[in-house]
Amino acid sequence: MAHKKGVGSSRNGRDSDGQRLGCKKFGGEAVKAGNIIYRQHGTKIHPGNNVGLGKDYTLFALIEGVVKFERMGKDRKKVSVYPAN
C-alpha cells in the first residue's frame, strides 16, 4: 500500500500576458515621424492623412505633427497627423 495519499493535480493555473494593444498617442498630442499611435488587431481605426499601416495593423505617424482622431461616415474612425503650426 502507498504510504502517501495520491494527490490530484489541477489542469488550470495558466494565463497569458496581455498584448498591450490600444492607443499610444492621444488626440492633440505631438508626434514625430515613426511614432506608434495605435496598436490593434484588424482595422478598428483606419489610417488617415500622414499615417501609415503596419503589417500587424499598427498605425504610425509618417510626419512630425499633431494627432487628430476623426470619423469616417457613420460607424468608422480614422486617425490623421497634421503638421503643427
Swiss-Prot record:
Record key words, sorted: Ribonucleoprotein, Ribosomal protein
GO CC entries: cytosolic large ribosomal subunit
Alphabetical list of SUPFAM superfamilies matching this protein: Ribosomal L27 protein-like
GO terms classed as biological process: translation
One MF annotation (Gene Ontology) recorded for this entry: structural constituent of ribosome
Pfam families: Ribosomal_L27
InterPro entries in the cross-refs: Ribosomal_bL27
Region span, Disordered: 1-21
NCBIfam families for this protein: L27
Annotated family: Belongs to the bacterial ribosomal protein bL27 family.
Protein name per Swiss-Prot or TrEMBL: Large ribosomal subunit protein bL27
